[in-house]
Amino acid sequence: MEFKGALTEQYVLQQLKINQNNIHYWTSKSNVAEVDFVTQVEDYVIPIEVKATVNLKAKSLQQYRKDYSPEKSVRTSLADFEINNGLYNIPLYLIGLMNNLIELE
């Protein structure tokens, strides 16, 4: 499906806005990498990478984490929930609960 990624990003944006999150995005200075959304939850600035499938490769999110060392990051996809070294993999169907889920670690 040609628009699967765009529709998935739109869904995530709507879920984030329901929670009153202010939404931004990030691009690298060379415009090679981009993170779909950046928001603040409590005292944390949270980069969010959206994947429409189970694909867990998020090179842009890896670049952001390398450059800025955020305590918490989110990748949302069709994969199962997992927390690994400050990286939260949140299934798409749970992204509306992100604000609660990032308090688990």
Where do the model's predicted regions map?
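A cross-kingdom feature that marks ATP-driven nucleic-acid transaction machinery
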Residues: 1-105
